[in-house]
């Protein structure tokens, strides 16, 4: 599976979120996106990111998010989330979403991360980056073992 290691500066996103169970997230998160864009929650957000935060192995907060700009007003019900500078493992995906994204995500968590001898997670968050409807990346915060 193709991936790259890259250094990223600290950054902040703003997003609309909900807590999800890890067991049902592959079914529930696509529904959350549909509800968000078909409902009244969409307050000018493009949804560049799917930010998974406060992951404890059983559940996590998931935010449909965009880059936060300091002068930006945060809509009611939205949250600002910051990510530390550091190394990230970046895994591209190509194809229909959510299937292509979920396939790479399963590989990352079930094969790559348990199998790598060089890296470990450095934080309890990760990101889905949406480049188009059929292309994106999964970003995993890592550090050398």
Residues covered by each model-derived region:
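A solvent-exposed interaction/effector surface
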Residues: 1-145
């Amino acid at each position: 599976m193709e991936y790259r290691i890259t250094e990223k500066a600290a950054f902040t996103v703003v997003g609309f979120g909900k807590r999800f169970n890890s067991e049902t997230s592959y079914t529930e998160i696509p529904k959350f996106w549909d509800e968000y864009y078909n409902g009244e929650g969409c307050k000018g957000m493009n949804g560049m990111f799917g930010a998974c935060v406060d992951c404890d192995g059983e559940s996590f907060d998931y935010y449909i998010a965009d880059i936060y700009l300091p002068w930006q007003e945060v809509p009611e019900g939205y949250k600002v989330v910051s990510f530390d500078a550091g190394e990230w493992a970046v895994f591209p995906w190509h194809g229909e979403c959510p299937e292509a994204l979920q396939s790479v995500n399963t590989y990352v968590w079930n094969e790559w991360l348990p199998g790598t001898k060089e890296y470990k997670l450095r934080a309890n968050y990760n990101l889905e980056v949406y480049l188009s409807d059929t292309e994106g990346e999964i970003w995993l915060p890592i550090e050398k073992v």
